[in-house]
Structure formats: structure tokens, C-alpha cells
Design a protein with these regions (language model features):
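Asp-based, Mg2+/Mn2+-dependent phosphohydrolase catalytic module
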Residues: 1-4, 96-99, 112-243
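N-terminal helical cap/lid subdomain that shapes the substrate entry/recognition surface
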Residues: 2-101
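Conserved SAM-binding loop
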Residues: 14, 87, 105-108, 140, ...
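N-terminal start-of-chain detector that recognizes signal peptides
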Residues: 15, 25, 76-78, 104-107, ...
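Small/polar loops that bind or transfer phosphate-bearing groups
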Residues: 16-17, 44, 107-108, 166, ...
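Conserved catalytic-core motifs of eukaryotic protein kinase domains, centered on the activation segment
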Residues: 19, 109, 118
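Residue-level detector of anion-binding/catalytic polar loops
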Residues: 35, 104, 181
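Functionally critical, cavity-lining and gating residues within the transmembrane helices
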Residues: 49, 109, 113
Length: 243
């Protein structure tokens, strides 16, 4: 079966935004009198804006509506991110390579749509993507598969012909639960998350520093064929459903 679309996570995958999130999330937690320490930070990697706001709301017994808390979190992030968000060079090379091929691409992130659109516009990446999706549009955030399944429905593509690019444990779990292949480039290996990350179909263990667009494209050539109807592609041989 040939690859027919690629879904990218945003933060830590397409763009080096984790430093900005650390600054804004620290400010968000401190706004309510808390301390955003390292163990808590590791637990929240890949969690998504609304899910993180919900955790803070519960931990500090806050009475503000969840939407209000998420809006504050997003404002703090955009203040930190504008003009300070860099695209990972090899990931930009991969996106442009897919664009030349005419490959449909989308972004599916735990960030709000406002943040996704702002970051993609600020970095010049927005024109490459057919659509963007946020976990805010679904019932459950990653590690549930909801946002990836939403993307598949909107792109009108089967999960099995989609490849997900991810950096987090929650993201890999979500992609696998959606029935999609996933390439992982973890910037952080959270305690207890090693097993999930190693379930990625293609893994760059050292994260973005080790990631190479050319290796991904070569892996795709080995893993997928150009047929619409074969069910298996191994060692360069296509297998027909009737074989």
C-alpha cells in the first residue's frame, strides 16, 4: 500500500518550541502560586494545552472556566513564541520534499488552533499544510487517537495509508492507537515512556539532533510501495490480496 498522506505533530516535532512552552507553562503555574518542577514537566510533555490547563485547574482547585484558563495559557505562550520559534532544519527539508511530491500533509497537535495557526504563519510553514487539527476539537487528547482519526476523516484517507511524525510518548501511543505508522524523534525520554516510544515504526533515539530527512524518505521507499491494492510490501516485493 502506498503512502498517501503525512500528519505532523507541531511542538518538538516540526518546530523547536519546547523552550517557549517551558517559559510560558512555568509562568502559567506560577500565576496560581505553584512551581513547575522537572518531574511535573516530564509528565506533561505531549499532553496538550487544554489537558494541561485541566490539570492545573484541578491541582490548584481553581474556579475559572477551563476555556478561560486555556486562553491565559495560550496568551502566555504566544508572548514567548512570537519571533522566537525555529523550524527544525531537517524537518523543514522533509516538508519541502513531500511538497515537491505533492504529498497531502496536515498538522495534528495538542495545542489550540489559535496557537497552531500562529506558529505556522510565523515560521512560514502554513502554505505546506492542507489542514490543521487540534485536540481541542475532540473529546480526548493524546494519547487517545482522536485527533489523528479526525485528521484521517477530514483528509478522506484510511489510517493505514497515513504516516505520523511525532516526538512524544503520548503522540506515539495516539498514532499507534489510530492504526497509523509513526516516525518518532523524542527530544526527551520520560520515565516509564521508553516502551511506548520504541513501538514507533521508525525511531531516531537522539531526537531532532539525529533526525535526517533523507533517512525518512529512504525508509518510506523500503516500507511502502506504489500500488493501491497490495496488502504487504516486504523486501521490495508487492503482494497482491490474492497471493
Amino acid at each position: 500500500m502506498k503512502l498517501q498522506g503525512v500528519i505532523f505533530d507541531l511542538d518538538g516535532t516540526l518546530v523547536d518550541s519546547e523552550p517557549n512552552w517551558h517559559v510560558s507553562d512555568t509562568a502559567f503555574v506560577e500565576h496560581f502560586g505553584g512551581t513547575f518542577d522537572e518531574p511535573w514537566r516530564e509528565q506533561c510533555i505531549g499532553m496538550g494545552s487544554r489537558a494541561f490547563a485541566a490539570v492545573v485547574k484541578k491541582r490548584f482547585n481553581l474556579h475559572q472556566p477551563l476555556e478561560e484558563l486555556e486562553a491565559l495559557k495560550d496568551r502566555l505562550y504566544l508572548d514567548a513564541a512570537r519571533g522566537h520559534t525555529k523550524v527544525f532544519p531537517e524537518m523543514e527539508k522533509l516538508v519541502k520534499g513531500f511538497a515537491v511530491q505533492g504529498m497531502p500533509m496536515a498538522v495534528a497537535s495538542g495545542s489550540s488552533l489559535q496557537v497552531i495557526e500562529a506558529v505556522l504563519k510565523d515560521t512560514g510553514l502554513r502554505p505546506y499544510f492542507r489542514a490543521v487539527f487540534s485536540s481541542d476539537e475532540t473529546k480526548n487528547a493524546k494519547p487517545a487517537p482522536d485527533v489523528f482519526l479526525l485528521a484521517a476523516r477530514k483528509l478522506d484517507l484510511s489510517p493505514k495509508v497515513l504516516l505520523v511524525m511525532e516526538d512524544s510518548q503520548h503522540g506515539v501511543e495516539a498514532a499507534k492507537a489510530a492504526g497509523m505508522r509513526v516516525c518518532a524523534l523524542p527530544g526527551v525520554w520520560p520515565k516509564g515512556g521508553e516502551e511506548s516510544l520504541r513501538k514507533a515504526d521508525l525511531l531516531f533515539e537522539k531526537g531532532p539532533s539525529e533526525f535526517r530527512a533523507e533517512e525518512v524518505l529512504e525508509w518510506i521507499d523500503r516500507t511502502y510501495c506504489q500500488c493501491d491494492d497490495c496488502t504487504l510490501y516486504e523486501m521490495g516485493v508487492c503482494h497482491d490480496p490474492e497471493d
